[in-house]
Swiss-Prot record:
Enzyme class: lyase
Reactions catalysed according to its record: 2-(N(omega)-L-arginino)succinate = fumarate + L-arginine
Keyword Amino-acid biosynthesis among record annotations: yes
GO molecular function: argininosuccinate lyase activity
Name recorded for this polypeptide: Argininosuccinate lyase
Pathway: Amino-acid biosynthesis; L-arginine biosynthesis; L-arginine from L-ornithine and carbamoyl phosphate: step 3/3
Gene3D superfamilies linked to this entry: Fumarase/aspartase (C-terminal domain), Fumarase/aspartase (Central domain), Fumarase/aspartase (N-terminal domain)
GO cellular component, one term: cytosol
Signal peptide location: none
PROSITE patterns in UniProt: FUMARATE_LYASES
Pfam families: ASL_C2, Lyase_1
The species this protein was found in: Rhodococcoides fascians (Rhodococcus fascians)
Amino acid sequence: MSEKLWGGRFSTDITDDVLRYTETASVDSRMLEHDLWQNIAHVLMLGRAGINTEPDTKALLAGLLDMESSRADGGLQLDVRQEDVHLNTEFMLIERIGPVGGRMHTARSRNDQVQTDARMVTREWLLDASEELLMFVQDLLGCPESEREAVLPGYTHSQAAQPISVAFWKAAHAQALLRDASRLMDAWKRININPLGACALAGTTFALDRDYTSRLLGFDAPMVNALDATSTRDWTVEVAGAAASGAVNLSRMQEEIVTWSSNEYALAEVHDSFATGSSIMPQKKNPVVAELARGKSGRAVGALVQLLVMEKSVGLGYSCDLQEDKPVYWGALDTYLDTIRLCRRQNLHTAFDGARGRALCWDNFSTATEIANILVSRFDVPFRTAHRITGDLVNAALGGGHTLRNVAFTTTFLREEHDIDISEVDMKQICDPLHTLRSYISAGSTGPTRVSEQQEQGLADVTDRLAEIRQARTRLWEAKAECLRAARSVVGGVSVPELAMEVGV
């Protein structure tokens, strides 16, 4: 007969190569804490419901608390021979307290167990990732006031378009990161529901109290349908999708850093601690964190695709196809969180050269739109006509080797070719990128006052969201504390009926 905990049906054990192919213990270690927490809550519920006797409940809880203490001290390691984290914890419990340890698995399956553990891990990751994103937003919006007038060229179609400020650019990326954090926390209400008690797929003939375990585990409520609870992985797709979108947003940001830190642009300088050199070219300084943030976004996108493909052909009811979610899912979440943290730190130590940006904008015609606007506002020229006149000016300047710095040329051309008289003093101001930037007044624009408004609004939003995250985190801490306190009470001699009155449920 097989020696596995499930081996009664089998005449022999699986071979070593089958074990290597099928085990998940090697990637389950992150769920160990949560599996023990879940076990304690489940045993408390079984005792409270009268499914297990009080002596058995006390013995089970004593063993589990001992295991939790060992885990906290780093002394609990998973054995791949036990296949997964769930069989590992049960096997270790039986080793500690004997056959009574087998009563822990009453009215439970690994199918609802793994879903419960994975949701518990994911909800904590949602809080961590959202918090990191929001602190990144704080850094971006809390940049020095001088960066509201530090000029950068703004681009469309990878061509110089209009002057913007460093602070405006940071505020734009901050908005994207705020949406990323919103997507993550919006998933909370679909993640933080309790599959425990669904068993294999159809529920159980035991009278379980799923509301009680939901409370002890910090879930909002039990999942409604047992078959759905054990079968679905759409929530991993949702989180992976949010991670993929967020990773792509960070990739776009870092693409600009890579470009602007090149010698040709010389708009940004990445700190040495976020760059590496070349093994052959002594002069090189490579922005490797920014480059890898671009490259590693592919992991998150790839994970999303793999999860979708994994789930598409699996009908309701658990199949081992679904265990393939964990390596790629955890990997994507880890990579995305690491990328957030490193990009945030790099941002704090990246210097921008506003003088260089202003010089580039003088020479790349990016203030031409402002000339057209002046023709509309001061000379009552229809915008389409003003657009054509300014385009004619740019074409003539390019043909003659001029830039908008040559105000003598621009004023002469407008006067002689289009009968528009603007003084050289006024034209110099109109074409000055910093003056143009200061002139923007529309809501949401790059004008310093408007950027200040964006920063103020965004920082207030961040403060509110961080408070919500702290509340959610506190609720999880309190739920675990209540669960452990109840377990210690039973081990210490409190009867299960007394415990029920003590917790007020």
